[in-house]
Amino acid sequence: MAIFFYDNGSRGREVLTDFIGDAELKALMSDGYNAYTFIGNELKSENLKDTVHLVCLAHLMAKFQKALEQGKDENARILLDVINRLYTLERSYDAEGITNEERTMRRGSLETKSLLIDLRQHLDFELAKPEEQRSGYLTEALNYLNHFWTELTAYTQDGAFPIDNNMAERTVRCLTYSTQQLISFWK
């Protein structure tokens, strides 16, 4: 479930840590918002120090899609293809109705690892090029992938971890839209 934490107009880390309090979390997924980059090792509660910080792959895909469509950078297509193949694996697991334990095993398989190696190699290849040879959008997407590599691939550690938070964001989006409509109605 995606929950956006705001207090006095802030999405800061303190808002999230105050909300979590002493709860124990196995994992927490976010976008790459800077306030959450230290989740798992700097949260106030001692019992959250081992929390796995996951970063949503859908946010990464959107960055490469933007590089392809707005930046007109065809090199983004190669990385998008690899990410799409990771999603194809996840959809096949869903269709088969496998257990979280089986999903963990398959995510640790050569098939998944090969895709992650391929993704990393393409990332490193693109980053080795002079920045002038790519669009600013592709540079942003590459830097995001590089910076959050561990968090973006952490979903493979446990079959219970989602690859993204799309379902939760779609749910929250409906609530947010309804709230915005209600507020504008009362104005």
Identify what each model region corresponds to:
Residues 1-187:
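Catalytic center-proximal scaffold of phosphoryl-transfer enzymes
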